[in-house]
Amino acid sequence: MDTNVDYSYSIKLEDENSFVDWGVVDSPLGEQISKTSGFLISKNKTQETGYWQCTEGSWNCHVTNTEFCHFLEGECTYVSEKGQVIKVNPGTVAVFPKDWKGTCSIKKKIKKYYCIIFD
């Protein structure tokens, strides 16, 4: 680790102005279309970290790179193509492997910290 670089960063998640509009989900299921926004902390050739939030709704999702998630707020359910169910509440930690496919159904707006590993 380079000791000349300050790796620390602080953000108040309550401050909605810190989040940038990232648009709507790609493959919505139903009429309620989820809107996403986020805050990028760092990104390089091997990883990306940040905060992400999403409003209520359901969609088909495809995780293209391994992703670690620590959910901070909200309630949702992920169901893989193989039928594995991941119920998410505040405090849930999940890892989605590269090429994970399934659905996401958000019941209450979620916020998460994420780290994507470009593999």
Predicted regions span which residues?
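Short hydrophobic/aromatic-rich beta-strand segments that constitute the beta-sheet cores
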Residues: C61, Y78, K112-Y114
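Short acidic-glycine-tyrosine-enriched beta hairpin
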Residues: K82-K98
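Short histidine-centered beta-strand/loop micro-motifs
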Residues: G50-Y51, W59-T64, S80, I86-K87, ...
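Conserved short histidine dyad/triad with adjacent acidic residue
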Residues: K43-V63, P97-K98
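Ligand-binding loop in jelly-roll beta-barrel domains
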Residues: T92, K98-D119
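A short, N-terminal "cap"/entry segment at the start of jelly-roll beta-barrel domains
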Residues: M1-T46
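Short, conserved beta-strand element in jelly-roll/cupin
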Residues: C54, V63-Y78
